Amino acid sequence: MKGRELKEVLAERNFPARDTRLLDDEESLGQVDTVGDEPTFIQSVLPEHLENVDFTFFASDETYTRNTWQMARNAGSDIIDLSYALEREPGVSLRAPWIERELGITPAIDFGGAPVCVAHPAAVVMALLLLRLQKVDSISRAVVTILEPASEQMPAPG
């Protein structure tokens, strides 16, 4: 689902792309999808499919990202991890653009640098809430318990 959402957001924001490739695991290989108005086949993640790719977005499950991200790095692609698989890897930059904006932080953009892992939406929402509450009064302690939706653990119907 994340891949489809990513594709829609990139299209809505007019992400400047000359060649968009849809790569996925074995389960999706050969399926036809569209990028813009053009039909395209979903291909496997192989080094030759990553040649001359400026940005690689990982929106798959964590295990698949862990098993394939080095191919993108070796191909010289900038990596944006939306699967949260790389957040504990050495040298990976954890980013939360909404939080950065709320704090007035303008981070330097280093293309060709470390992979970027985007903070989990639940963490971003909690951080925004706490930052805004802190503007009203000081916070001495905050305890948050976030449970993963059961639907994330259940096998897909089929």
Language-model features and meaning:
Residues 1-158:
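N-terminal Rossmann-like NAD(P) cofactor-binding subdomain of oxidoreductases
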